[in-house]
């Protein structure tokens, strides 16, 4: 029986990514997102360079009538120490909407206390209204997203998806021990 359980579990563990593979995937995502941000908003480069820190996340989300949910992963970078903190995120909310959206977010922290709170406690509560339509490299997007917290600038870029929504969302960000050891 124990041999059977070992063999059944083998394919799952053989396909599991190592912590370094996860970190590398997140670093590559960060590089791509920042390149896209700087191309679309050149002023963001100086804003990020002068900030206490920033975070970059990918997020896939679904909005069905009155409920929305999503999850993703990313990294918070401390500009003063140069340290990266690898994290996950999950969102949930209520509001009117319909669609699926794959987007990237860059969160810029202008105050040290805000960056430290984000990394240590990880909560954000946002109101969001947007319309996005983008499939592959076609389509367009229009976003109006702003954190309720002052001292923070948020950029959102839709990668793929189609969504029309007006939601009140809670987002939880947290450190992933496996990725930070």
Residue ranges of model-derived segments:
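Signal peptide processing junction and immediate N-terminal pro/mature segment
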Residues: 12-16
């Amino acid at each position: 029986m124990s041999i059977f359980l070992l063999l059944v579990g083998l394919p799952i563990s053989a396909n599991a990514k190592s912590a370094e593979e996860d970190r590398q995937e997140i670093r590559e995502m960060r590089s791509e997102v920042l390149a896209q941000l700087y191309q679309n908003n050149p002023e963001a480069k100086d804003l990020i360079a002068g900030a206490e820190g920033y975070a970059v996340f990918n997020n896939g989300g679904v909005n069905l009538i009155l409920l929305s949910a999503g999850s993703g992963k990313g990294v918070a970078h401390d500009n003063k120490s140069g340290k990266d903190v690898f994290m996950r995120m999950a969102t949930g909310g209520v509001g009117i909407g319909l669609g699926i959206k794959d987007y990237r977010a860059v969160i810029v922290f202008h105050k040290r206390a805000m960056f430290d709170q984000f990394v240590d406690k990880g909560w954000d509560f946002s109101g969001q209204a947007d319309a996005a339509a983008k499939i592959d490299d076609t389509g367009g997007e229009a976003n109006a997203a702003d954190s309720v917290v002052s001292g923070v600038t948020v950029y959102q870029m839709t990668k793929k998806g189609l969504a029309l929504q007006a939601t009140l969302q809670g987002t939880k960000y947290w450190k992933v021990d496996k990725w930070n050891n």
